[in-house]
Amino acid sequence: MNIFADFDARIKKTLQDIDLKQKDGGELDLSRIGVEPPRDASHGDIATNAAMLLSKAVGQNPRELAARIAEALKADEDVESVDVAGPGFINLRLKASYWQRELLVMLNEGTDFGRSRLGAGKKVNVEYVSANPTGPMHVGHCRGAVVGDVLANLLKFAGYDVVKEYYINDAGAQIDVLARSVMLRYREALGESIGEIPAGLYPGDYLVRVGQELAGEFGTKLLEMPEAEALAIVKDRTIDAMMAMIRADLDALNVHHDVFYSERKLHVDHARAIRNAINDLTLKGHVYKGKLPPPKGQLPEDWEDREQTLFRSTEVGDDIDRPLMKSDGSFTYFAGDVAYFKDKYDRGFNEMIYVLGADHGGYVKRLEAVARAVSDGKAKLTVLLCQLVKLFRNGEPVRMSKRAGEFITLRDVVDEVGRDPVRFMMLYRKNDAPLDFDFAKVTEQSKDNPVFYVQYASARCHSVFRQAADQLGLVDLDRVAMGSHFEKLTDESEIALVRKLAEYPRLIESAAIHQEPHRLAFYLYDLASSFHSQWNRGTENPDLRFIKVNDPDLSLARLGLVQVVSDVLTSGLTIIGADAPTEMH
């Protein structure tokens, strides 16, 4: 249960009970009242700005109104004390019995604790990675892959019906270049000396194997075909090979999409999907024939000093109108974006999230314009931009050669440090801030390495369970037994740990609402820190040890507390896509 939602309801009921009205006699708007943890934990457990928010409408001084509300809140059986602070904040401190009851709820819910109905089954499409199928995934793709995947997992846990989607950019000019590059490697595999890879083609050695496979399958047949026919075959085989490599890279990172959508699907049957999308916009009055003035600076590829078919995107929030069809009748890349959005919308998605690299910042307004025009303002579109990842080793930048074809791949990073450190650390800064990734730091066994610190807390929980088996003979811990003596948990440090656990449902909902999965990584680190601190208190003070052989009831209660810590760590790490280890060496 979200205790802050619980007290939000209680506070609003209290406001109704004291018959609080607007000074003109009307009903008060209580929807904007905030109920949250105080910034300083010493101030209490629950804070609300109700008095400050309502004082003007009520016509009463904020502190006087706060005192009136506080007096009424003292009647709540779970409230130990109520204080008014500053200009009119109301801080509530709750009784230990309330936290003990909440801990029992958490224990009974297990790893489902924190799961929310916030999304109410609403369909959400999360598109992420969508790397061009022209080579292996590089480290620059890694952050977007993790942010998108964890956000999708988070939204599912918050009750949304989520589809994870990958858009395969397999219809552009870069695919033609790729096919010609592989054709060269095919000829090389047949024994021809190809010399230096010509400028403009893909030089990567990863294409050698594709050429060899084509030589093994076709022999010299491709050389005997008309070039266009041979290139069509090479293109199909190469896209399949590249996507197999990309899927394998993503699998190594524990990223699994539900849908792989091919751009070429939009171009079948004379680009019927694109034509239909443009016709739909035309019927709505969003398309016209015209000429665009030349943009300042470098000219984009789709600008022509001729009449084109244009999208009135400025009428729906964009900076300039966008070309859909060139003067020669060919479609722009943007026209494909319109058709792809329409396809998603027609599949029943009213909410779509695009996770893109920071270099796609210029796409945001045009995509938002497409969403407004195609859906008549009914669809919600969000674009999350992921800033660059800078690689370090022992604090020194990792240099990547500028020579063509040389870069650090996603697989290189995962193979060196492991999947879990990569996933966790890619979340350890907000997506729109640059991130430093140090190979040495993420494998360090210290508090300064967040993923180690969190996973070590999980392992420590299980070491407590093993100690319980050795010292108390409790091999199979029973949740009913563990939850039957929570009234024995009275030490302030234990109650503080319960408070931290109780934040989890609110954290899940706020991270989902704001689409900020990094909040989960921060919370897990804070929870791990609280648990390690409690462990250390037991080391310093025998009375606070999790297991007291001479007091089995207290031991069971503390084991129940450890079990809930383990459950929340497991839940959060599962959403992140990392393991919750039972032991670490």
UniProtKB/Swiss-Prot annotation:
GO biological-process terms attached to the record: arginyl-tRNA aminoacylation
PROSITE patterns: AA_TRNA_LIGASE_I
Record keywords: Aminoacyl-tRNA synthetase, ATP-binding, Cytoplasm, Ligase, Nucleotide-binding, Protein biosynthesis
Pfam short name (any one): tRNA-synt_1d
Catalyzed chemical reaction(s): tRNA(Arg) + L-arginine + ATP = L-arginyl-tRNA(Arg) + AMP + diphosphate
Major subcellular location class: cytoplasm
InterPro entries: aa-tRNA-synth_I_CS, Arg-tRNA-ligase, Arg-tRNA-synth_N, Arg-tRNA-synth_N_sf, ArgRS_core, DALR_anticod-bd, Rossmann-like_a/b/a_fold, tRNAsynth_Ia_anticodon-bd
Motif 'HIGH' region boundaries: 131-141
The EC number(s) this enzyme carries: 6.1.1.19
Superkingdom of origin organism: Bacteria
Compartments (UniProt record): Cytoplasm
Cellular component, GO, one term: cytoplasm
One MF term in the entry's GO annotations: ATP binding
NCBIfam families in the cross-refs: argS
Family: Belongs to the class-I aminoacyl-tRNA synthetase family.
Assembly information from the UniProt record: Monomer.
Alphabetical list of PANTHER family matching this protein: ARGININE--TRNA LIGASE, CYTOPLASMIC, ARGINYL-TRNA SYNTHETASE
Name this protein carries in UniProt: Arginine--tRNA ligase
Annotated source species: Brucella suis (strain ATCC 23445 / NCTC 10510)
